[in-house]
Amino acid sequence: LVGATFKGNDPAGTLLAWRGFAMHDRQTTFNESIAFAPIASFNTTALQYQANQVLPFEEVDGRFGYYAGIHWDYLKKSQFRFYYYDNNGDPAALNRSTGQYAWDTRFSSVAWLYKFTANTRLIAQMMSGTTAMGAKRGVNNSFYSHFVLVSHKMAKHRISMRYDYFEVTDHDDWQFDPNASEGEGITATWRYQLTPQWQLGIEGSALHSQADNRMAMNNPKNLSQQQISLNVQWRF
């Protein structure tokens, strides 16, 4: 069993509402700000105090949140993880000087790793939750995502395939501020262990997504994106 209490992440739901999920491996650093695209609804009276950026680690309402979880391992072949997260946010709280609301964000997360052999494994994870802001929960969304990854190692080579699905569902009645989005993607990766310290790799991904707020910014609702990246990694 694991658990903790925390503060300093009240605006986290902002990203899900106005950007949606994103497929990348970049971690936001402490005190970093993340700018939004020119969201049309930020020009309305209802959202006039919302900044065009989010500060994910800001404390707004002074409340403590918590998470609790359970880990279960079986015969060194199977690992199961379950977590429940609640930031205990007050959705009516607002810091006008920074333009950040406290979002009420809650979710459950389930993860499973299974080793078919010493060289082949499967990893799957699912997350489902809700997030809302405003005194009357003017922005009120639910979100869901899952991925499945299969990885196989052959001598110094490792090949992996991953499928992702994600969605944000808009439950509020603010027609001027659409938040719904959905997407799926597939990623293929090859890694080569050149030495104990050096690793080479290539990764290709394809993503198709749709977001209702894109049209207000004169962008197509549906987008398809592809990316190929090369990787050189040194560990010490």
Please provide the spans of the model-predicted regions.
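Aromatic- and glycine-enriched pocket-lining scaffold segments that form the walls
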Residues: L1-K77, Y83
